[in-house]
């Protein structure tokens, strides 16, 4: 029997599984990020436009994060002593992960650490080995994953009038 644990000849009945290693190697962890910025202007106006994209695959299967961002800023002297500042910032974020505790990715890692190597992962018949009714392999195979999407757009503007009176200016601000 001990030999079967050592050589892995009967992994369903005599498993020797490093559950944490299996879990952390189930995803690629690959990430790529791209950014593009355009800046310009003239004597009275300057602007900056920046867009970004990041796609990050999780170290565990079925976990990922995709994020797109955009930023626009402009500063312009629209008349002598009258300055306009505009800022617009937006993002879209998609996060895929296990659903809820203790089945969240943190819970899965915690149970993978606790799960002894003598409990099978996924067996040849498709069932799973369990300790205390928890199996990281079973959670990862389940459909209980969610996609959280968050989006935000914020904008602000400021109009500054530097009056002819030395040291006196008026500032108006708006934001959403």
What is each stretch, according to the model?
Residues 31, 42-43, 77-79, 164-166:
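Outer-membrane beta-barrel channels and translocator barrels
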Residues 1-16, 58-65, 69-154, 169-176:
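Surface-exposed loop/interface segments of Gram-negative outer-membrane beta-barrel transport/assembly proteins
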Residues 44, 158, 168-172:
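Secondary-structure boundary/capping motif
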Residues 156-163, 176:
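Alpha-helical support elements that line or immediately flank enzyme active sites
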């Amino acid at each position: 029997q001990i030999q079967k644990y050592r050589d892995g000849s009967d992994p369903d009945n005599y498993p020797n599984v490093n559950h944490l290693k299996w879990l952390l190697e189930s995803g690629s962890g690959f990430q790529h990020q791209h950014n593009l910025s355009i800046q310009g202007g003239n004597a009275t106006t300057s602007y900056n436009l920046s867009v970004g994209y990041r796609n990050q695959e999780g170290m565990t299967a079925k976990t990922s994060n995709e994020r797109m961002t955009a930023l626009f800023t402009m500063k312009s002297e629209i008349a002598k002593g009258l300055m306009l500042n505009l800022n617009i910032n937006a993002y879209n974020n998609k996060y895929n992960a296990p659903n809820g505790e203790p089945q969240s990715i943190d819970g899965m890692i915690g149970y993978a650490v606790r799960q002894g190597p003598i409990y099978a992962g996924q067996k040849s018949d498709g069932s799973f080995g369990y300790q205390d009714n928890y199996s990281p392999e079973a959670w990862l195979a389940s459909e209980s994953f969610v996609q959280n999407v968050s989006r935000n757009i914020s904008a602000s503007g400021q109009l500054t009038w530097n009056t002819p009176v030395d040291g006196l200016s008026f500032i108006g601000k708006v934001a959403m």
